Amino acid sequence: MDITWLTERIAVGGGIWSTANMEVVAQAGITHIIDMQIEFDDTPLAVDYDIEVLWNPTDDDFTFKPAALFRRGVEFAEAALQKDGTKLFIHCAAGVHRAPMMTLAVLCSMGWSLNDAMELIEGRRPVADFADVYVESVEKFLEEEMDPRGR
């Protein structure tokens, strides 16, 4: 199973695809999943493991992504991480574009600078690739959507 831990509670990676892999996810202590892949919804696989899934599908098509996509993910992540003992796994099919993009939005919403968050993700997960249009999408979301509390 392709899981890269960025912090003690946030991981990024590739697709789950099977019950056996979902069992590995559960054994890793993951309680919440943001599934960015359009190809497959993890929700049915997670039911038996009491893992909450946000299926937030988007195509890896190198086009600008709307703020609503990031808002859904960030709100889910914030709600999940407010609870003690939770762990969040953000993934797409390969863990190269879409999952790192959403992870960037989540980390920045938690107060990380864009550059520091990108360095963390790329440092721990060298296959992560930040397409310019995806970084611009995250920046636009952060400029327009984050509230004045400076989250």
Please provide the spans of the model-predicted regions.
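A phosphate-binding catalytic loop at a beta-strand-loop-alpha-helix junction
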Residues: 85-104
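Cysteine-based protein phosphatase catalytic domain of the PTP/DSP
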Residues: 1-87, 108-140, 146
